[in-house]
Amino acid sequence: MKKVYATGRRKASIAKVWLTPGAGTMTINGLSLDAWLGGLEAKKLRVKQPLALTKQDTSVNIVATVLGGGFGGQADALRHGISRALVRFNPELKAILKPEGMMTRDSRVVERKKPGKRKARRSRQFSKR
């Protein structure tokens, strides 16, 4: 029985993903996908996207631990981790996932606040007179 491990990242979130051949169950932080994400349907679809594209949704079991960030970052980190695990499980799937951008780590992070400004770029209100 082949067990594959991969890590996915997005913003401040890190997803540790273990993938094994099985019936298609998905456990995240000890919960099912529906219990973990609740009513966030768009994020559920995003997490399932690599499995749907490669038609592996009923042939692999996924156990994942996700840390840090919010639900959006965690869902995208999990998607990245699942994609990387699928490619380690079956290298032929890279040809499907790479053009869809699922193998690429989204490196966008929050820009830091600068001194003398209210936010990263927002300046204080300027009064000409």
Curated annotation (Swiss-Prot):
Sorted UniProt keywords: Ribonucleoprotein, Ribosomal protein
Q: Which domain of life is it from?
A: Bacteria
User: Record's family?
Assistant: Belongs to the universal ribosomal protein uS9 family.
* Underlying gene: rpsI
Q: Could you name the Gene Ontology cellular component terms for this entry?
A: cytosolic small ribosomal subunit
Question: What is this protein's name?
Answer: Small ribosomal subunit protein uS9
Provide ranges: composition bias, Basic and acidic residues: 104-113
- Report residue spans for region: Disordered: 104-129
PROSITE patterns named among the record's database cross-references = RIBOSOMAL_S9 (PS00360)
